[in-house]
Amino acid sequence: LYNNVTLIEANEEAYNKFREVKHDIVFNIAEGAFGVSREAQIPAMLDMLQIPYTGSDALTLAICLDKARTKEILSYYKVPNAKFFVADKIEDAGNYDLNFPMIVKPISEGSGKGIYASSFVHSKEELKREINRITSEYNQSALVEEFLSGRDFTLAILGTNGDAKVLPAIEMRLD
């Protein structure tokens, strides 16, 4: 289908490289370079240059990488999700109305980064340890959620606006 494929690294030089070559479409799998909105950087460049691309737009990616903002939006639209709080420091471990067990995650990472067996906490001491690990290792807040037991599924949506289709559910299994 496409005879001329160019690989462009998602770094500081990407903008100029996109400007140099006329692209029919960009297959965006970029994670971005730096910062909490890193996954939105390439789509924002492509929007500015009016180059079509696959995947979510810059705004969607920026919001989704912030787990707390995503959960607030889900809650606003009455989509059920686990109770949570955001911890910036160990002292925040006492400011919650959640039940154990809980799961502690970096607030602005994806693909399971920063989540280990120790992320599932059953006591205030374990909670403090995990908040400290995430705030020190990742230099960002920790998202603390009540752990929801059960099966884990992910859904993909293909298309935009009124032409979107939900693809079949995929179960995420760790066994």
Give the residues covered by each predicted segment:
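Phosphate-binding site of ATP-dependent enzymes
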Residues: 124-175
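Glycine-rich phosphate-binding loop of ATP-grasp-fold ATP-dependent ligases
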Residues: 102-130, 152-154
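Generic preference for hydrophobic
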Residues: 26, 53, 84, 104, ...
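Rossmann-like NAD(P)H-binding beta-loop-alpha module
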Residues: 76-110
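Alpha-helix N-cap recognition
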Residues: 10, 89, 122-123
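Alpha-helix C-cap/termination motif
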Residues: 20-21, 96, 136-137
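Conserved N-proximal alpha/beta basic substrate-recognition cap immediately N-terminal to
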Residues: 3-85
